[in-house]
Amino acid sequence: MMAPPSQVQGRLSSSMNKSLALLTVTLLLGGCQSLIHKTPDGTPPVEDTAVETKAKPEKYGSFSEDSLYSLLVAELAGQRNRFDIALSNYVVQAQKTRDPGVSERAFRIAEYLGADQEALDTSLLWARSAPDNLDAQRAAAIQLARAGRYEESMVYMEKVLNGQGDTHFDFLALSAAETDPDTRAGLLQSFDHLLKKYPNNGQLLFGKALLLQQDGRPDEALTLLEDNSASRHEVAPLLLRSRLLQSMKRSDEALPLLKAGIKEHPDDKRVRLAYARLLVEQNRLDDAKAEFAGLVQQFPDDDDLRFSLALVCLEAQAWDEARIYLEELVERDSHVDAAHFNLGRLAEEQKDTARALDEYAQVGPGNDFLPAQLRQTDVLLKAGRVDEAAQRLDKARSEQPDYAIQLYLIEAEALSNNDQQEKAWQAIQEGLKQYPEDLNLLYTRSMLAEKRNDLAQMEKDLRFVIAREPDNAMALNALGYTLADRTTRYGEARELILKAHKLNPDDPAILDSMGWINYRQGKLADAERYLRQALQRYPDHEVAAHLGEVLWAQGRQGDARAIWREYLDKQPDSDVLRRTIKRLTGAETP
């Protein structure tokens, strides 16, 4: 155990003081490797402030014995993984000594630990105590940008620019993505100010283009990049130009741009990946498959690429190839759950029920667990194995209690979708015994109650949800629509739907409800307007049934029949459409 400062002071001679000072300086210079670069899990942390230019070595000043002792304790604490003590001591000493080396060390520790405020404070101390150190100025600029202090960040970034260092104007611009328009406008002015001094600086031009993109001005951003001959062939501006073209519905121009970029940068993964993804977006699946296969061949250790290739193969219905890549992922112990889930999907496509169930059963907790449980349940129910489905879900709830509520929801939904309404009701009731006030379970029970014509229970559950979450647009809309459709309480229905619409004005389901309440109240023109908006956003057979009914009520039977015919061709098993057509025309078909 280390002696307290008073005892240490009593034992130190002047020569020992010098030795201790040398030891501490050695620790300060070398400790960064032991504390920062050798992380607890053995992996080096990402260093945001890394640069190509070599900084001048910091000169350490003379420290008091108390400071030396505090710094030694910090280093020993770091070696024992007590990073909280190491950070605290270094921050205090950085503030006390104003020494560039101590400030840098404090900053590196804070950055590694994700201590944002300490990283900001110590980066500023470092930058002020080492005005000629470009690393320090860049660190301060980045931390200020992270803190939303963009104008101050620009000041420090300009110092880096003046020193011909590697700037991060792109990071500064990206960090402002979620800011308000006034802040972006001010930042754009700062960029323009610097561009007057450095009109051909590619980093500045790229940063400004990013800001213009975020400001909803893609045409100006694209023009800026295309007019900048100095950086138009660099990878980052090239990728931004591609994204801008796609956002402007000019993907046909983006493809040749990226293809030319591949020729210019054949070893750059980002360009080839952007090209492959754009091929997928344009539904050129065979070309995309070939491009992803080339990427996997070029970067054989990149399992993210291998997984993307497998998904493209699935989309292209290249089943055998998809299986090969998915099984490779399992063998490589990478994307294992996602691989099993997609192997299950593949088996379903090939009508191999046993293989599908086996693959879904191997998906562990994580992003693919619930989708796998849902598919497994659906497969069993379609095969008539209702009891087995219930047993598997019960076992899953027992083994993974954190997923219990979602598993009750899956069980009820799957049973309801497979015309097992009574069993769905029993499942949701069992869930509510365990979790009586869970809003998702209550909402689901309300939907099942409506199918059972138990409107009182439906309204009770939805009122409970709304009381707990007054701005729950889904619950407001569900209750409002049901009151409009199943009762004559149109005033209440309208109030609920209007509130939902105010909360979520572009939601197709809410727009459908707006159309329906207007129809119920005889406002046919408004009804048609809302229903057409809903159908444009979500081409759905139920919305088409509603729109056709409104057109029929307007005396536009031909238009109504055309809508019904179009959507009946798309979904011939739609009960809603067929009931509407039968009720209004007396015929089975329009």
Swiss-Prot record:
Q: What InterPro entries does the entry give?
A: CellSynth/LPSAsmb/PSIAsmb, TPR-like_helical_dom_sf, TPR_rpt
Q: Which UniProt keywords apply?
A: Repeat, TPR repeat
Spell out the residue ranges that the record assigns to TPR repeats. 235-268, 269-302, 370-403, 405-438, 508-541
Repeat as UniProt keyword = yes
Annotated Pfam families: TPR_16, TPR_19
The record, for SMART domains, names: TPR (SM00028)
The name this protein carries in UniProt is TPR repeat-containing protein PA4667
